Regions:
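Proteolytic-maturation and junctional protease-sensitive modules
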Residues: 412-468, 509-511, 518-520
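Surface-exposed, glycine-biased beta-strand/turn segments
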Residues: 20-99, 105-110, 125-134, 139-140, ...
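Short edge beta-strand/loop segments characteristic of extracellular beta-sandwich folds
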Residues: 236-242, 382, 424-428, 495-503
Length: 565
C-alpha cells in the first residue's frame, strides 16, 4: 500500500470559523449527528483482535449526513487510510479530550483542500497529518465533514470516539453524555468452569459448560444444583447487552463476580489503551472463539494481560479451603443502569483435590524472550508476546507442490499472540537466485506473511502461530479498467474507475499520471476499486493516462490509455 506520512506543520492562515478564540471552559458536548441516536456498535464491543473503541452511530444505511463538532476545539489531526478509519478527523478540546470522527465520505471543504494539498505534495493517497498548534479552530455544532463508509467500514455509519488527549486512551463516550435509549437488561447464555490446578491457562485447560435459565435480569443454573470445584478453579461467562428499542447485541459495561459477598473479579469498560487492546484475545477464551465462534469472557486474568479493565483478588482464581457450600454471584451492568444477577452454589471436590498435580511442562514464560532454532527454522518470541507460559511445540510437515520449503508447524494456531514473532524458514536449493526476492512465507490458509531472503532463509514477522512454508510471487497485479479505454471521450464523466487485485503478496503501491504528472488515485480496499476524480488540474482536450500498480514483491502492471476530456 502507499506509504503513510506523518508531517508536523504549522498552519498560519487557515480557519474554519471567524472565531479567533476557543472557550477554555467548554465541557458540554453535543451529538455529532442531527439524527435520533441509534447504535450499531458500542464501546467495548467484542471485535476480532480488539475491543471496539467508540460508538457506531447508524445513518439509515446512507452516506452523506453532516457531521458536527461536538464542542469548541481545533483540528489536531487529519487522516486518510486505505483501511482502518478511512477518512477521519481528530479534534482536540480545551477540557483535555479528543473527539474522533471516522469513515467519513468527505471532509469540510477547507479541510479537504488541505488534505488534498498534502496528498499531492507527498504523492500519496494515504496521509496522516497532525497539527502542532491550534490554527484550525472549530466551534461547537460546526460541520466538519459528512458521514460515509470509507476504510474498513462494513456499511454506512459514523464511528465516533472520545480519547484522553494526553494519554491517547480510548474513553467510553457514554460517560460523557452520549447515551442512547436502553431499557434492556444484560442477557446471560451460560457459564464455563475452568479447572486450572496450578497450570497456566491454555486451550488444553479442562472446562465444563453449565446452562442457565432465567430472564429479566434474574438467572440461575438450569439443571445442576451445585458446581464442584477443583483445587484452583475459575469461570467464564457468555453474555451480552441489548439496546431496546434499537435492537442488536452489544458489549457489557461491567462484569462483577463475588464469592460469598466478596468481590473477586471486576471488569469495567471505562477506558483502555490501544497498545493493550489486542489483549481481548486473553480476555476471551481464544481457542473456543476460533473453534466454535463462541465468545466466552473469562472471569480471571492471565499474567500477561495488560488491559487496565480489571480489579481482582488472586486474578479471579478460586481456591476453596473447606467443604462447605459457597455462593458465587455474577452481576452484569450496562451504562443505562440495567443490571442482571446470576447466583449459583459451589463446593470443592475432594476427590479431584487428591489427584491434581502440576505437570511443570511449561518451558517458556511470557515475560522473557524465547528462541527456538534448528537447521530449518529460526524463531524469536519476544517478551510480552504471550499472555501465559506455554510448552512450545514444533513439528515438520511434508512439502506441498509448488513450494520451496517443507511445512513448519510453529506451536498452536489457537494460542494468541499479543506481539509479532520473527520467523525464518530455510529455503530449498531449488529457490534460484532470480526468485529469492520474490519469496514469501505463507500460512496454512494460503495467506502471505511477506518476507525477505537472508542467508538461505526467508524471514518475516508473523502475527499468529500456525503452519508456514515458502512460496514465490512472480505474478503482477491485475488492472481492470471499468469505464475507460484507449481513445475514449470522457466528457461528462466525473471519474476514471479501475478494479485492481493481486494473487499472493498483496497490493503495495499504485501510481496514476495524466500527461506525465502525478494524480490522486483513491482506493477502496473493500471493493478493490481505484479511481481518479477529474478536477481543475485536467483541462479539456487530449490526454494520456498511465496507471502503475505494484505488489509487495515488486511485480508491476502498467495500464495506458489516451482519452479526450
Amino acid at each position: 500500500m502507499p506509504k503513510s506520512f506523518i508531517i508536523f506543520l504549522i498552519i498560519s492562515a487557515l480557519s474554519l470559523t471567524a472565531s479567533a478564540q476557543i472557550s477554555q471552559t467548554n465541557t458540554d458536548f453535543r451529538f455529532p449527528l442531527d439524527l435520533k441516536p441509534s447504535l450499531s456498535g458500542a464501546f467495548g464491543d467484542l471485535r476480532p483482535n480488539h475491543f471496539h473503541s467508540g460508538l457506531d452511530f447508524r445513518t439509515n444505511q446512507r452516506e452523506g449526513y453532516p457531521v458536527y463538532a461536538i464542542a469548541d476545539g481545533f483540528v489536531s489531526r487529519m487522516r486518510v487510510q486505505i483501511g482502518g478509519f478511512g477518512q477521519a478527523i481528530y479534534l482536540d478540546h480545551p477540557n483535555g479530550k479528543t473527539s474522533v470522527y471516522a469513515h467519513l465520505c468527505a471532509f469540510h471543504p477547507k479541510i479537504a483542500k488541505l488534505v488534498k494539498d498534502f496528498q499531492y505534495r507527498l504523492e500519496s493517497f494515504e496521509v496522516d497529518v497532525p497539527l502542532i498548534f491550534s490554527e484550525l479552530p472549530v466551534k461547537k455544532g460546526e460541520i466538519i465533514g459528512w458521514s460515509g463508509n470509507t476504510g474498513s467500514s462494513g456499511g454506512p455509519h459514523l464511528h465516533f470516539e472520545i480519547r484522553d488527549t494526553k494519554t491517547e486512551e480510548a474513553l467510553n463516550p457514554q460517560m460523557f453524555g452520549f447515551k442512547v435509549p436502553d431499557v434492556s437488561k444484560p442477557e446471560i447464555r451460560g457459564i464455563y468452569l475452568y479447572q486450572l490446578n496450578g497450570e497456566p491457562f491454555s486451550e488444553d485447560t479442562p472446562k465444563q459448560y453449565f446452562a442457565v435459565k432465567g430472564a429479566a435480569g434474574t438467572y440461575s443454573l438450569a439443571t445442576t444444583p451445585v458446581i464442584n470445584l477443583s483445587a484452583e478453579s475459575a469461570f467464564g461467562i457468555v453474555a451480552f447487552d441489548r439496546h431496546v428499542p434499537a435492537g442488536g447485541t452489544y458489549g457489557l459495561y461491567k462484569i462483577e463476580l463475588s464469592l460469598d459477598g466478596e468481590n473477586i473479579y471486576t471488569a469495567t469498560w471505562n477506558k483502555f489503551s490501544f497498545d493493550a487492546n489486542k489483549a481481548i484475545n486473553s480476555h476471551l477464551d481464544y481457542a473456543a472463539l476460533k473453534k466454535t465462534g463462541m465468545s466466552i469472557q473469562k472471569s480471571f486474568v492471565e499474567p500477561g494481560n495488560a488491559l487496565g479493565l480489571y480489579h481482582t483478588q488472586q486474578s479471579g482464581i478460586i481456591k476453596l479451603e473447606d467443604n462447605e457450600l459457597h455462593e458465587l454471584v455474577y452481576k452484569l451492568s450496562d451504562l443505562a443502569g440495567n443490571t442482571s444477577t446470576f447466583r449459583f452454589k459451589v463446593k470443592r471436590n475432594m476427590s479431584s483435590y487428591a489427584s491434581e498435580k502440576s505437570s511443570s511442562l511449561k518451558n517458556y514464560t511470557f515475560n522473557e524472550d524465547f528462541r527456538f532454532n534448528n537447521t530449518d527454522v529460526k524463531l524469536l518470541i519476544p517478551k510480552g508476546a504471550l499472555y501465559s507460559p506455554i510448552s512450545f511445540e514444533y513439528s515438520l510437515g511434508t512439502k506441498l507442490p509448488g513450494t520451496y520449503s517443507q511445512q513448519h508447524r510453529i506451536h498452536r494456531q489457537n494460542t494468541p499472540l499479543h506481539l509479532p514473532c520473527t520467523l525464518s524458514v530455510k529455503a530449498d536449493a531449488n529457490l534460484k537466485p532470480e526468485l529469492r526476492d520474490k519469496a514469501v512465507l505463507v500460512d496454512q490458509r494460503g495467506v502471505s506473511q511477506g518476507g525477505t531472503f537472508e542467508n538461505g532463509f526467508v524471514k518475516s514477522e508473523i502475527k499468529n502461530f500456525g503452519t508456514f512454508h515458502i512460496r514465490v510471487d512472480t505474478i503482477p497485479p491485475k488492472i481492470t479498467p471499468m469505464n475507460i479505454n484507449d481513445g475514449k471521450t470522457m466528457t461528462g464523466i466525473s471519474r476514471i474507475v479501475f478494479k485492481i487485485a493481486d494473487q499472493l503478496s498483496g497490493i503495495a503501491t499504485f501510481t496514476g499520471k495524466i500527461d506525465g504528472k502525478w494524480i490522486l488515485m483513491e482506493y477502496d480496499q473493500k471493493t478493490a476499486t481505484l479511481w481518479h476524480r477529474f478536477d481543475e488540474k485536467t483541462l479539456p482536450g487530449k490526454h494520456q493516462l498511465e496507471l502503475s500498480v505494484a505488489d509487495k514483491k515488486g511485480n508491476t502492471s502498467v495500464y495506458k490509455a489516451n482519452f479526450n476530456l
